[in-house]
């Protein structure tokens, strides 16, 4: 490239031939490429720009970067700006990043860490001598060449460009390596190149322990702790494993006071990095990557010994090809029609981005948050703004604003439709002072909403046939799956996902489009929408309803719970079961083969799917786990390839290199009894709450990191037994209240009183009641001020103060003639399950809408998140193998 150019506008493919994609980051893909003129290999980062982003500010930085030439710095070749893509061309480092390496090899040896630290310090010494800072030292930005040379990447031009783009996508991941003076820049008055030395110390710990300190904490929580005056610099956890020299090196690098922190030149004189260290150490590391020795990185799980009883990895449905006699209830299943369950207002969203990063036709089903453009307009700002922290804002404030920008803290709604009672709430009276007001959005009427059950199903009250539909902020829940009778159906021409029930929902679709104008033009361009998923044929235009269909016969598992997931690559839909024998899956697109596959060999009592992340309570110690679902399926395929002599169930779940370790324990969550997940409709935050033996943990979903992260740990005497554990969202509070019981009401017109723990309080503070708890089987928040409480044979619909909700369109009480075990809320009714069947009752009239009863079978609801899953066993043999059903449409419904 001509050195006179700072940002070339010519076609980069005239100079470089792309060979293969070698990486994918939060803001672009990285390709291995070859210079067509010289044959020299290069690494090219291709970044897709968003409209309005201007990189003129980095042109001077690009020119300056051409002067940076050092053996420990990735060489910068140049940049291209072509159409809406920015190409950054750099030196190719075939060994990969240290982060990629330790994911395969496990922790680096002390000598390897010393070698890498020395080379990193040499690169920083050069940069600092040129008056430059790196600002982003971490394992992911330290690369190895094929012959073991260490190179610093993503600084200078890349750091400046990353800074702008990170404001929208990746910024939240960086606080763990940041120095305290960076976090408190507003109070401390800026920072200098010594922040890079702090990052060297953190990176040394990262290479030794596979993650930086505080990595399990929510980024905001980590930043907050760093700004506290009593913050203590982190240390290596294992005192005996590492030498005194290593411990002292980390201590020196992590000197809290930057004025006392040694420079790169000074640290290069430390005995830890002045010992005999050769490039052969890095070459040994690369050899380990290319030829991993599984025996060297076993990370066995001492708490969870291998299962005592061998369970099959694959379970086939019985009588798959034999025509068998149907039970009485199965005959009725084919005759009784049900409306699909609907999303409740507090249910976390399930977004399914396609390979291009945009949502396809499934967007109309799963995407309920406003677009990024809406948020930018609402807050009067785009992606511009100061990233580096010598500006007027502290890092804490910048990250908080970034969370606002991403919708983590956003869009408060007006409460004009609330009852007068809610403005004099006995519940709110015990709540600490409200948070400062947040920006308000355009008001969208809320009177139409309500919803469903403990497994995050939903209800949005719809008018009866003939009544005009009213606008709603939350779109309908996905229609139930419709199963092919013999073989998978090739899905080509799907109906609009909003056309649930003929004309009535057609009007709903039109009104939804009016409220989401930013997506309208894109939808109009799609004459033929993509299928929602394989195994989910398009919903019929006419209102034929759905019914229960058998998906598995003779299941030997002791199942506790069920959910579902759509693979973003294949679009196949899977049922996921949590059982005593482990976590199993069933592909709804392969019911002609009908077999369950084991995904995880540990006992599972609760699970929940969030995007491509599976949360579970698993293992002998009942600990919260986080699983990467695509990785979990790949891992299962790896297990199938093992020799028959090595039963998969006897392999510890992390015997393979860390690269394949897709299931991780969430720290500080042992002996978890129950969990619940909720979305705050006022802010868009999504929370996971777990009840431990003597405390409660609250975690928040961090979208850029695609994981739940700890924000609160509250000591609390958990009731025993713990019958009730749900979160309730209240206005003007950042965190939801945690309901641990329900007692009889004491105030005027109060039918129930919620016993709650308040995470917003600065102390472990909870409501106390001198009245005994009622026998409540179910509590769920349908709307912001509408809660469904299930008591024995009765369902009461109350507000946050426990008073009955009265409405012409809604009965405040629904009565059943049996003991309710579980419920699912449908469009216009509640479906209650009992031991020998189920009954639906209308929200409007309390009249029976559906009923199925079979005294020869015992029924149990396994889950209703996206898909309603039902189990039945023979009454005369309750331990016999079970049959499994889902609420689904019929092939003949077209």
From Swiss-Prot:
Interacts with SH3GL2. Interaction appears to regulate MAP4K3-mediated JNK activation. GO terms for cellular component: cytoplasm. Residues 16-273 form the Protein kinase domain. Residues 556-867 form the CNH domain. SUPFAM superfamilies: Protein kinase-like (PK-like). The keyword Kinase applies. The keyword Signal does not apply. Ubiquitously expressed in all tissues examined, with high levels in heart, brain, placenta, skeletal muscle, kidney and pancreas and lower levels in lung and liver. Belongs to the protein kinase superfamily. STE Ser/Thr protein kinase family. STE20 subfamily. One of its GO terms (biological process) is protein phosphorylation. Residues 513-529 have a biased composition (Basic and acidic residues). Gene3D superfamilies: Transferase(Phosphotransferase) domain 1. Its EC number is 2.7.11.1. Serine/threonine kinase that plays a role in the response to environmental stress. Appears to act upstream of the JUN N-terminal pathway. Activator of the Hippo signaling pathway which plays a pivotal role in organ size control and tumor suppression by restricting proliferation and promoting apoptosis. MAP4Ks act in parallel to and are partially redundant with STK3/MST2 and STK4/MST2 in the phosphorylation and activation of LATS1/2, and establish MAP4Ks as components of the expanded Hippo pathway. It catalyses: L-seryl-[protein] + ATP = O-phospho-L-seryl-[protein] + ADP + H(+); L-threonyl-[protein] + ATP = O-phospho-L-threonyl-[protein] + ADP + H(+). The modification N-acetylmethionine is found at residue 1. Its cofactor is Mg(2+). Residues 473-487 have a biased composition (Pro residues). ATP binds at residues 22-30, 45, 48. Keywords: Acetylation, ATP-binding, Kinase, Nucleotide-binding, Phosphoprotein, Serine/threonine-protein kinase, Transferase. The active site is at residue 136. One of its GO terms (molecular function) is protein serine kinase activity. This is Mitogen-activated protein kinase kinase kinase kinase 3. The lineage of its organism: Eukaryota, Metazoa, Chordata, Craniata, Vertebrata. Residues 410-536 are annotated as: Disordered. The modification Phosphoserine is found at residues 329, 398.
